[in-house]
């Protein structure tokens, strides 16, 4: 499987690398993409050194099966067509597509089946607070129907992922 990570040098991109390795995700080829600032940076993944490529509107995503994106909403929106035009499934970690009716908003523990219906080739995930909440609520819903819930959430001043 050919896998790409967009925003590979950021905190979330680095976490993608760690989790993919930790869970022994089946990867034949890993492509890393980033900004002008991070292009050329090298990371080691499963004993192999991989250089971050500059993210551009070209055919670099041809043959990619899955692209994990964590470079911010603007970048996700700007590059979505470039990433998906050759059939890659884009799994976006930004807020860019969370309200798009043609993009499933998926928390695998709760609605994994929704990921199968992706007219635009994109899967979005909710805000991190929402993810934790709905996983817990799903367990409660399995026991007894929840009619209503009131939630207050306090968010970090920066969603960048690093202090």
Please annotate each region the language model reported.
Residues 1-163:
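N-terminal Rossmann-like NAD(P) cofactor-binding subdomain of oxidoreductases
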């Amino acid at each position: 499987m050919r896998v790409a990570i967009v925003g590979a040098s950021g905190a979330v991109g680095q976490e993608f690398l760690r989790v993919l390795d930790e869970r022994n995700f089946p990867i034949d080829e890993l492509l890393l993409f980033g900004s002008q600032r991070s292009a050329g940076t090298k990371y080691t993944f499963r004993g192999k050194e991989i250089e971050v490529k500059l993210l551009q509107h070209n055919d670099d995503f041809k043959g990619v099966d899955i692209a994990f994106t964590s470079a911010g909403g603007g970048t996700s929106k700007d590059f979505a067509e470039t990433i998906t035009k050759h059939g890659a499934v884009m799994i976006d970690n930004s807020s860019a597509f969370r309200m798009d009716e043609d993009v499933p908003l998926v928390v695998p523990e709760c609605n994994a089946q929704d990921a199968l219906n992706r007219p635009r080739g994109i899967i979005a995930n909710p805000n991190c607070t929402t993810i934790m909440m709905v996983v817990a609520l799903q367990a409660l819903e399995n026991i007894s129907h929840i009619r209503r819930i009131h939630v207050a959430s306090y968010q970090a001043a920066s969603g960048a992922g690093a202090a």
